């Protein structure tokens, strides 16, 4: 990987195109990371990917990877960073207090409470000095806005120093509004627009997931830069179905 660090590109709001990884397959991760994507979203929340499997994926990836942890706890965040993730995506961050805690988990003292171990992130100790000198600045902190409570608190959340980006979760957000799955409902779109407005004013990068590239284009036009399009299992299934359809059509 060459050029500016991933954290720098994210903070200056370059367009960063990624996809979600749910398969604990290093081959899939390697293939995806050589396809022109800027980053990979390793899903440790919904997918059956534990930290050992995630570390294997990180070892084969050729682009920066953000690991979504199962929950916003110090232990989960620490493990994700220790195995070598470029940063974390933390679900259900619904208040500034939660956001401050997440940032603290990601930063070494005196900026936070992250513990130190001899781990993959710093070359098992052999790259300790370099990693420790840069980790606080280069570790990416992404909080998810996927509940109406987070929308209501979004101005305070984006004001938290150390929050690099807000990733909107449309499906869970719609569910919290009593509109599960209705991601294009006017009320859901208005809530998402509220988040976008707050991020724009605060200078925070803004991210979102869509299942299809065509549905992502309008969001990019609106200023979304940390974008995740599709899921590995969907790409695999779609390709197989297309092949069968072509041959039997």
Residue ranges of predicted features:
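Expand to "…catalyze enediolate/carbanion chemistry for C-C bond making/breaking, isomerization
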Residues: 1-249
